[in-house]
């Protein structure tokens, strides 16, 4: 039986095993790796590995299958010469960086935006002219993302410890995310919406329902304020995410029988004609606020307890609602 053994390097701390292994084996499909996990073909410290387990420096991973087909040249270099340092920085110190992302910019590289994206702009801002693709070494990165056509605040880490703690902050919902959005028609719901969310990876869509359904996870969205703009037949909303799932706000609005202005993916039939003239969805990530952080659990980020960041970007839909605030 073919086996391969790896010792997790120093730069890696508290990373999900599937995330680590997919970087190590860049040509393996996620479904293939999950199957190998279920079959016990991946060992972590001499014990059958499980999905979601976390690995750190010094841990030993053994693959009990031929890994050669899933490898490629780890020295592949991404040249950032053409990338501009055009970040709109709201806050920056030695550990963290908070930026305003314009609508239309993707947060992470993908097939259509391999070079020009927010992640590469961050690297250029931090002095990188190149980096090694699929490297397991730490590089500055954002701890979350917002949709391409959403504008506003994104927070990233400039050190490995800051990244690990920041990811834990997100997992425990200790960073409040507030948005402003514009929807069609009057909006009468106010308060906390508890629902259930599941993602269809093949269609890049999510489903949100009021009651539990197979493979769904609970989510919480708070609709804090709304103002109906009578002449425009639009409503301006203030929304706070407790959980932070993909397309959460957009799909939750569908559950309430409305949608964001400009949203094509979650477009409702009754708004199709009115929705044609808008290029981006009307959603703006306006505020990020740290909760009170435990010094023992977050030795680095505890210093940012109660710290708030406010977007300085003027969203594209501001011209529609000039003079309106909620």
Curated annotation (Swiss-Prot):
Name of the protein: Uncharacterized RNA pseudouridine synthase MG370 homolog
NCBIfam families xrefs: rluA_subfam (TIGR00005)
GO MF, one annotated term: RNA binding
EC number in record: 5.4.99.-
Any single biological process term in GO: enzyme-directed rRNA pseudouridine synthesis
Domain of life: Bacteria
Enzyme class: isomerase
PROSITE patterns the UniProt entry points to: PSI_RLU, S4
Active site: 147
Catalysed reaction equations from the record: a uridine in RNA = a pseudouridine in RNA
Record PANTHER family: MITOCHONDRIAL RNA PSEUDOURIDINE SYNTHASE, RIBOSOMAL LARGE SUBUNIT PSEUDOURIDINE SYNTHASE D
Limits of the S4 RNA-binding domain: 15-76
InterPro entries from the UniProt entry: PsdUridine_synth_cat_dom_sf, PsdUridine_synth_RluA-like_CS, PsdUridine_synth_RluC/D, PsdUridine_synth_RsuA/RluA, RluA_PseudoU_synthase, S4_RNA-bd, S4_RNA-bd_sf
Similarity remark: Belongs to the pseudouridine synthase RluA family.
């Amino acid at each position: 039986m073919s086996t391969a053994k790896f010792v997790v390097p120093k730069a890696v701390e508290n990373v999900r095993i599937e995330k680590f292994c997919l970087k190590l084996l860049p040509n393996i499909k996620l479904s293939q790796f999950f199957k190998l996990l279920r079959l016990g073909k991946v060992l972590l410290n001499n014990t059958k590995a499980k999905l979601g387990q976390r690995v750190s420096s010094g841990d030993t991973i053994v693959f009990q299958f031929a890994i050669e087909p899933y490898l490629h040249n780890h020295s592949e270099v991404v040249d950032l010469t053409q990338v501009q340092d055009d970040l709109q920085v709201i806050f920056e110190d030695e550990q963290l960086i908070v930026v305003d992302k314009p609508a239309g910019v993707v947060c992470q590289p993908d097939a259509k935006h391999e070079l020009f994206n927010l992640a590469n702009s961050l690297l250029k801002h931090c002095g990188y002219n190149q980096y090694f693709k699929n490297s397991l070494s730490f590089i500055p990165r954002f701890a979350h993302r917002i949709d391409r056509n959403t504008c506003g605040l994104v927070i990233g880490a400039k050190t490995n410890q800051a990244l690990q703690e920041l990811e834990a902050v997100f997992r425990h919902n200790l960073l409040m995310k507030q948005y402003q959005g514009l929807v069609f028609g009057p909006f009468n719901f106010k308060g906390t919406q508890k629902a259930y969310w599941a993602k269809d990876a093949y269609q890049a869509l999510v489903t949100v329902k009021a009651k539990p359904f197979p493979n769904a996870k609970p989510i919480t969205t708070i609709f804090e304020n709304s103002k109906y703009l009578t002449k425009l037949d639009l409503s301006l909303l203030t929304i706070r995410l407790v959980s932070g799932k993909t397309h959460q706000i957009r799909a939750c609005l569908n559950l309430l029988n409305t949608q964001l202005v400009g949203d094509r993916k979650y477009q409702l039939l009754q708004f199709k004609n009115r929705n044609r003239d808008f290029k981006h969805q009307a959603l703006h990530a306006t505020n990020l606020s740290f909760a009170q952080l435990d010094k023992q659990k977050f030795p680095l980020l505890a210093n940012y307890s109660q710290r708030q960041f406010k977007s300085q970007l003027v969203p594209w839909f501001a011209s529609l609602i000039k003079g309106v605030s909620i």
